[in-house]
């Protein structure tokens, strides 16, 4: 059937900010879908709240709205735009839930708007746990014994009937949010309460636990003519019980027989047909290891994390195809854009093994609960491709960027056998490394399988890697063995370690012996048809499929997996850099390892290498491609860390030179730059040991800000108030950055701001200045930022502009540079310079309408800023007021303190724009999911230093209609100024009233600035944890509370009696 002619304008709903469970895969799928619809001639209107995405660029849709994804705002857009249809299936769970809510309000019927792709009845049947169970029973597809519960009592009754353990799955949530495995009544009550709170329909499914079964996923597509295909099947390394987003995943399935694959394939196709899904869908199965018994776990009736992985694993662009199916095209009418010869109805075939590894945030949250279960905890993921499972797995481990090039944590060698066994039994984020350690101690496969409940096939592969390590250690410089271990994915650095050499010597040895990688193409058809996709992976075989072109090329290093501190913002900059390289007439080559992102879409660069971002892997690509140079400034710290080792090996780094990068990153060199320019800077110093650190702090006076050098996202950065705290900090955190000293600065209290500038070595352009709402001491990535600044005098703006231009010129910056300032006593103090793209580049690009990364790339490639139409200085402010607000994922992680400080904790961002600051703030809070009640009870408990300021805020909260509750010290301060307040006992008095009131929704807002006691048992920590667990808005900064008051005051009308 040809595409539909009766619809012309389509509204696409994006997926909002990046949170755990919903990451960059939706930027990738959303971008693909919008472009596919435009390709077919439709007018596309996009709404999304996340400015850090390619999807929200003006070229992606005909009109782009960066607005909160709420019924209130999207309804406004629907009334204004009057689209014919909505495509809700590519915005993740957020998009689906919003479509359901809009439908329930009646606005879609009122305006005659239809939903494309998957119908609401299908979404309901797949997402509503009871309807899904009924459908499966009708199809005779087995599901685990289960019951629907709408309250805790119902959940307990069913658990008593079938016995523990049970799995709890909330309805209409994503990433397993609110779910878990309960082993007893206490755990059941906790998980069920949380799940009911987080489910938008207050419903959970309680089911018999089938933990231990194999978990298998099928990615399927169907069109309106009922043609259906399997795009990819995948098998989880972890058995059922660990969320698939937190499990290692292999594609295609590795341990299933043909009969099992066909059985599950038939079931998946039967389910997608019964649901009448038009587009992509993900079906998850649990398969018994010892029989042909299986259960259907769940169905996602939309584009998902797994479909992004399947797209990159096979080269088959699922979201693009789903969008075309949604407008009526059939699979046999759509060309496969990879081969450009076959049709989309051909099922992809793989002649390689793909491994996906999750990337967890526990390097940021040392106290976090690392146990893995049905609720997802990973922030991102990496993918690697190899010809053997071992090669694919080892490449994935190097891609993770957790300081390892091989599955070996040296510290684990010190564990006792009991401790090691305990870690293997319990699924956690480092289980792979514990399993490898067990084989190094000669545990048998049977012993490890018994402890871990893992499939012996996978354990055998890990054991094989350990056996090869032993072979290497026993046969130093054996060239035959060298060729063999390279085929199994061993890194030069690991071989060098076992042979007592330097990695460069192993590399040299390989080159002399012609043991070199070749590059194979990902072509969707296992080489059956000729393909011209420029999408490659390395392996050690004989023939290569990647041929260097005659055109001069530039290599851009991507930013690797998404993690806290290095998010999708850097992928955004990478993609824009590629566009500019192509505009300048060069061939653009990308190297990256992240399957979720737009940069690894095969249609973006002229060539894509899906490879780990390590020195060895990058040098291998450079050897083949011989680029004019390498651009590192858009890939975050991942790429910057490669600059020096590449330059040392004679590779040309384009943009700011390595020497100048070092002058900005090395503390002593940077101090010299600041002194030579006579710029104000907080007093500080460096130390390489504890005694030196204590001496520096003593000299400059407490409080001090301490951090290691060369880090991103404020890793291991803290504000320290006395010598004891400093002593503790050095014992805990200083090993974070080997070879680099600790930096210690006097901590100034003041307004913070930052600026991104572009320079060509002469002209320096400042597109805009962003003022932070939270004062200095909270990481810039966790602060709300406002453009243009609202409270700075012209004198301060001039100081910032002047200092930025001087710094840029002195550091010989070519490309982008980010500078952060504290405004203290009328002076702009420089606190940090980052000579690269920062995480504010997308936000600033959107609000100033200047594509910063493209302008910077053209400058790097030699097109001066004057030729691009720019002069030195700060550009005039654009219209409107724009607020960038951080978004956190604390509700997904247990035992993680939400108190904000100098170490970054947010996973994503949203933007609110309007004509006044209060309105822009309101939109930013709504977009970030912080829905503020206009009245209620506010619990305020603050440290002594904040009491005066908190009193002024408390008065304003009373005026807008809030009742106040405070702990005794804070309450006394309020009562002194005549504020009405109820006193509540502190937790250490043995009373739990505070926590009970939060749990029972008797508190609508919590403001808590109690000290960052590292103890998880402290009062402040427990209050903050309770607020997050029960979804009560929580502020840990008085500045954020002040911003919220601006919004509440905007909404409140003044009421006062008439004067007598």
Curated annotation (Swiss-Prot):
Residues 133-327, 671-861 form the ATP-grasp domain. Its EC number is 6.3.4.16, 6.3.5.5. Binds 4 Mg(2+) or Mn(2+) ions per subunit. ATP 1 binds at residues 129, 169, 175-176, 208, 210, 215, 241-243, 284, 298. It comes from the Bacteria. InterPro entries: ATP-grasp (IPR011761), ATP_grasp_subdomain_1 (IPR013815), CarbamoylP_synth_lsu (IPR006275), CarbamoylP_synth_lsu_oligo (IPR005480), CarbamoylP_synth_lsu_oligo_sf (IPR036897), CbamoylP_synth_lsu-like_ATP-bd (IPR005479), CbamoylP_synth_lsu_CPSase_dom (IPR005483), MGS-like_dom (IPR011607). It catalyses: hydrogencarbonate + L-glutamine + 2 ATP + H2O = carbamoyl phosphate + L-glutamate + 2 ADP + phosphate + 2 H(+). Mn(2+) 1 binds at residues 284, 298. Mg(2+) 2 binds at residues 298, 300. Mn(2+) 4 binds at residues 832, 834. Residues 547-929 are annotated as: Carbamoyl phosphate synthetic domain. Residues 930-1060 are annotated as: Allosteric domain. The keyword Nuclease does not apply. GO terms for cellular component: cytoplasm. Mg(2+) 4 binds at residues 832, 834. Mg(2+) 1 binds at residues 284, 298. ATP 2 binds at residues 707, 746, 748, 752, 777-780, 820, 832. Its cofactor is Mg(2+); Mn(2+). The large subunit is composed of 2 ATP-grasp domains that are involved in binding the 2 ATP molecules needed for carbamoyl phosphate synthesis. The N-terminal ATP-grasp domain (referred to as the carboxyphosphate synthetic component) catalyzes the ATP-dependent phosphorylation of hydrogencarbonate to carboxyphosphate and the subsequent nucleophilic attack by ammonia to form a carbamate intermediate. Large subunit of the glutamine-dependent carbamoyl phosphate synthetase (CPSase). CPSase catalyzes the formation of carbamoyl phosphate from the ammonia moiety of glutamine, carbonate, and phosphate donated by ATP, constituting the first step of 2 biosynthetic pathways, one leading to arginine and/or urea and the other to pyrimidine nucleotides. Belongs to the CarB family. This is Carbamoyl phosphate synthase large chain. It comes from Lacticaseibacillus paracasei (strain ATCC 334 / BCRC 17002 / CCUG 31169 / CIP 107868 / KCTC 3260 / NRRL B-441) (Lactobacillus paracasei). The lineage of its organism: Bacteria, Bacillati, Bacillota, Bacilli, Lactobacillales.
